[in-house]
Amino acid sequence: MKEVDIIKLSQEIRHLSKENNAVILAHYYQDSEIQDIADFIGDSLELSRKAATTTASIIVFCGVYFMAEVAKIINPTKKVLLPDLKAGCSLADSCDAKSFKKFRELHKDCVSITYINSSAEVKAYSDIICTSSSAEKIIRQIPEDKQILFAPDKFLGGFLEKKTNRKMILWPGTCMVHESFSERELIDMMVRHDKAYVLAHPECPDNLLRHSHFIGSTTQLLKFSAERPNSEFIILTEEGIIHQMKKLSPGSTFYVVNTLDGGCASCNKCPHMRLNTLEKLCLCLKNGYPEVTLDTEISNMAKKSLDAMFKMT
């Protein structure tokens, strides 16, 4: 899109947002143009907290469907819009509610800690929700004699098992972006840029995490890079975060690792996140849809597990 078109659309979006008393929340994995127009940018935990405290009449969530669902669960009387309702999540899709409910029935005595990257229905069948930045803190509060069932990300679960020295029952889900990085490409890049810090999201497989200098949530990765100006960084997460990293560390250099199939680094963009565009954002503010709606019973059940997260963090 031409710069002049971006400016024009951005102006219209700001006008519509003010006119409708709307707040625009955007995840770090959104396109830079959307990040720049948002009222608030953050990771899943930060966006959840912002959704819980907003006084706006309308919440426009520039992220994926499960994130907009969380905003609706927290604010059942507010209108929640998602620029593209098809913006799903491969990780959330890897754990369907029917199978998860049966899985829970097989492990009735377990405490179910579910990653926020999950559907409202799965959250409804869970005890506690967590994010990548809050998971360790939550797990450490569970009594040692209680078995934990962790879903849906097996790589995040494995990372947390090592961090907490706590064996858990793991659901075998994965994120299509974080499991796609090539270890060979990473090692080659580390050789070429031997002074670079390797920063990884814990949704990455262990063969990538073991090469990393720092592992954390998107916000934690952002903080790490901001505290080390004029440095080099190899990034093992969705490349949308680099837009904010460059803003906070303009003198630093950031590298993106290619994918397993040898494809271009642009394959590390989440295709679901990128379904949201400035044009769709403008249209949803103008028309008041697509709107996220939820079954009341499911929403109330899911809110209990989200409230447990907020209480423990």
Swiss-Prot record:
The keyword Cell division does not apply. Transmembrane segments: none annotated. Pathway: Cofactor biosynthesis; NAD(+) biosynthesis; quinolinate from iminoaspartate: step 1/1. Its EC number is 2.5.1.72. One of its GO terms (molecular function) is 4 iron, 4 sulfur cluster binding. GO terms for cellular component: cytosol. Binds 1 [4Fe-4S] cluster per subunit. Keywords: 4Fe-4S, Cytoplasm, Iron, Iron-sulfur, Metal-binding, Pyridine nucleotide biosynthesis, Transferase. SUPFAM superfamilies: NadA-like. Its cofactor is [4Fe-4S] cluster. Iminosuccinate binds at H27, S44, Y115, I116, N117, S132, H201, P202, E203, T218. It catalyses: iminosuccinate + dihydroxyacetone phosphate = quinolinate + phosphate + 2 H2O + H(+). Signal peptide: none annotated. GO terms for biological process: 'de novo' NAD biosynthetic process from L-aspartate. InterPro entries: NadA, NadA_sf, Quinolinate_synth_type2. Belongs to the quinolinate synthase family. Type 2 subfamily. Catalyzes the condensation of iminoaspartate with dihydroxyacetone phosphate to form quinolinate. This is Quinolinate synthase. It comes from Ehrlichia canis (strain Jake). The gene is nadA.
